[in-house]
């Protein structure tokens, strides 16, 4: 599995700000979108282009346009919504596919509860977004679902990942690409990433 830990100074700085214990909901939400945008920039760097001729201000001009599969952004509810706007800055015409997963606090296993995907999934590249890759369960289950619907071109974008989650995702889906702002130290007994960001969903939505 291709794993890219984006080490751009802006990414490192913004993730550092997100780790502050007293970060406000507004600030955390803004930073989640900003880092999501920067991860998208990296994840789309290998998109193929083709030359086309358009009518410019002074006559025909040859330009490059992205070709290949159309993009669908797949936020995993609910926390993935916090990264979605940042992703859409770069691919504003992308279709949005929504998958609802929550983690059982006792078993730490993902439980699906909602699915609304774009049409023609086999023809699309999916950018799956979720702030945290902890055990990897929610991401793996979401990718399972996408593949069941015929989508074979998939990239996962997460703010922070635990080594355990990276290993689990690689074992389940070695053909998927992972882009993250940070691979942190480990998971604690409750399944939270250390040092991590805390509960990203609560911080994005202002719930406790």
From Swiss-Prot:
Pathway it works in: Pyrimidine metabolism; UMP biosynthesis via salvage pathway; UMP from uracil: step 1/1
Matches recorded under SUPFAM superfamilies: PRTase-like
Regulation acting on activity, per entry: Allosterically activated by GTP.
Similarity section: Belongs to the UPRTase family.
Note on how the cofactor is bound: Binds 1 Mg(2+) ion per subunit. The magnesium is bound as Mg-PRPP.
An annotated GO BP: UMP salvage
Entry binding sites for 5-phospho-alpha-D-ribose 1-diphosphate: 78, 103, 130-138, 199
Keyword Transcription regulation carried by entry: no
Enzyme class, broadest EC rank: transferase
Name this protein carries in UniProt: Uracil phosphoribosyltransferase
Keywords (A to Z) from UniProt: Allosteric enzyme, Glycosyltransferase, GTP-binding, Magnesium, Nucleotide-binding, Transferase
EC number(s) on file: 2.4.2.9
Function summary: Catalyzes the conversion of uracil and 5-phospho-alpha-D-ribose 1-diphosphate (PRPP) to UMP and diphosphate.
GTP-binding listed as a keyword: yes
InterPro entries for this protein: PRibTrfase_dom, PRTase-like, Upp_B, UPRTase/APRTase, Ura_phspho_trans
MF (Gene Ontology): GTP binding; magnesium ion binding; uracil phosphoribosyltransferase activity
Catalyzed reactions: UMP + diphosphate = 5-phospho-alpha-D-ribose 1-diphosphate + uracil
List of residues binding uracil: 193, 198-200
Source species, domain of life: Bacteria
Cofactor: Mg(2+)
């Amino acid at each position: 599995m291709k794993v890219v830990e984006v080490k751009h100074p802006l990414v490192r700085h913004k993730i550092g700000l997100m780790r502050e214990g007293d970060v406000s909901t507004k600030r955390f939400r803004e930073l989640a979108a900003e880092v999501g945008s920067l991860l998208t920039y990296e994840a789309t760097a290998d998109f193929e282009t083709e030359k086309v001729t358009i009518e410019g201000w002074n006559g025909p001009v040859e330009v490059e346009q992205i070709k290949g599969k159309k993009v669908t952004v797949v936020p995993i509810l609910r926390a993935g919504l916090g990264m979605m706007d940042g992703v859409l800055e770069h691919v504003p015409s992308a279709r949005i596919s929504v998958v609802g997963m929550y983690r059982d606090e006792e078993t730490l296993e993902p439980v699906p509860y909602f699915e609304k995907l774009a049409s023609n999934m086999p023809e699309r590249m999916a950018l799956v977004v979720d702030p945290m890759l902890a055990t990897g369960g929610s991401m793996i289950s979401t990718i399972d679902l996408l593949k069941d619907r015929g989508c074979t071109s998939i990239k996962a974008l997460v703010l922070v990942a635990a080594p355990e989650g990276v290993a689990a995702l690689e074992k389940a889906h070695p053909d998927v690409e992972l882009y993250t702002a940070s691979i942190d130290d480990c998971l604690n007994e409750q399944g939270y990433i250390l040092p991590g960001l805390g509960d990203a969903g609560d911080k994005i939505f202002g719930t406790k």
